[in-house]
Amino acid sequence: MAERPKPGSIVHVEFHVKEPKKVEKFYGSLFGWKFEPVPGMDYSLFEAPSGPPGGVGGLQPGNWEEGIVNYILVASVDDHMKRIEKAGGKILSPKLEVPGQGWFALFQDPAGTKMALWEQNPAALNTPRDRHTD
């Protein structure tokens, strides 16, 4: 079993795009990435040969724009949202749940880079769908 990521590690890479299937075909053909559709969503999970797993999905309502967002593992999304604002960052979304997996919030650093916080649900650590700790 691989070592679990430590807080502060990038644990997920996400492509926010208008046409997910085009992106999947592009990266799959170039690099051999395998994509697994998530039932009931315009979203697929992928794994590259190494590095963090990721996702490709259609744009979501609200503060979502085309681009790539890296997810950083934290012990508490709530605590880090406060710390980000105190450090001069901006919170772009409320804390949201990925059912059965964990919670996230989008933020922007003082230079304008968009990133996300990820808090793993401890109950999900031993499930087959857990791609953030294996």
Please state what every model-predicted region is.
Residues K34-G40, S93-V98, P122-L125:
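Conserved catalytic-core motifs of GNAT/GCN5-like acyltransferases
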Residues Y27:
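Catalytic core of tubulin tyrosine ligase-like
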Residues E19-P20, I72-K114:
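Vicinal oxygen chelate
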Residues H12, D42-Y43, S93, F104:
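Short, acidic/polar N-cap/turn motifs at the starts of alpha helices
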Residues M1-E24, G51-P52, G67-N70, Q120-D134:
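N-terminal beta-strand motif that seeds the catalytic metal site of vicinal oxygen chelate
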Residues L30-F35, G88-K90:
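Conserved acetyl-CoA-binding loop of GNAT-fold acetyltransferases
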Residues G32-G67, P110, K114-Q120:
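Conserved short beta-strand elements that form part of the metal-binding/catalytic scaffold
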